[in-house]
Amino acid sequence: MKVLIPFYSMYGHIYRMAEAVAEGVREVSGAEAVLRRVPETLPTDVLQKMGAVEPQKAFAHIPVCTVDELAAADAIIFGTPTRFGNMCGQMRQFLDATGGLWVKGGLVGKAGGVFTSSATQHGGQESTILTFHTFLLHQGMVLVGLPYAFAGQMRIDEITGGSPYGASTIAGGQGERLPSENELAGARYQGKYIAEIAAKLKG
């Protein structure tokens, strides 16, 4: 059973969360986690001005995702940073190329979920995941979030990402904050949970 994890990461926060999601997937017997980057749309000179070139070298070895890989997966867990309360443009452009899959019903019945990051605690994490869910529903996918069975969502002793809609992390205004252990635990839980649901759907 293949669980695809397509993500976009500018400074590495979503990449780290994607790794944690993959760790959770691999806890399920017979589940294979496949990490993929979605294509970059920004020119190199713009990325340099944004200070993203060096951070992106850490995951440059991850292959770029293709639309065909979505159809071949048994479950898909998408990772995107928040951009003004929505998914990033790179992810949007990638998803806009899936019209052929929609026509064929290529994603119907597959388990799907989303994880995200934002600069601030209330920077649009939930709206990003919820608006992303619209795509999954149009494709006929089965939505899977991060249930409250993950007790880390109930913590009030620290600032942390995570909601019933999916795992998330807070990066800080300058990207200075790395995902906390609680946030990574949420990502692992979501990865494992979606893989378990996918296994049941696959029969």
UniProtKB/Swiss-Prot annotation:
The keyword Manganese does not apply. Its cofactor is FMN. Keywords: Flavoprotein, FMN, NAD, NADP, Nucleotide-binding, Oxidoreductase. NAD(+) binds at Y11. Substrate binds at W102. It is an enzyme of class 1 (oxidoreductase). It comes from the Bacteria. It catalyses: a quinone + NADH + H(+) = a quinol + NAD(+); a quinone + NADPH + H(+) = a quinol + NADP(+). Pfam families: FMN_red (PF03358). The keyword GTP-binding does not apply. InterPro entries: Flavodoxin/NO_synth, Flavoprotein-like_sf, Flavoprotein_WrbA-like, FMN_Rdtase-like_dom, NQO. Binds 1 FMN per monomer. One of its GO terms (cellular component) is membrane. Belongs to the WrbA family. This is NAD(P)H dehydrogenase (quinone).
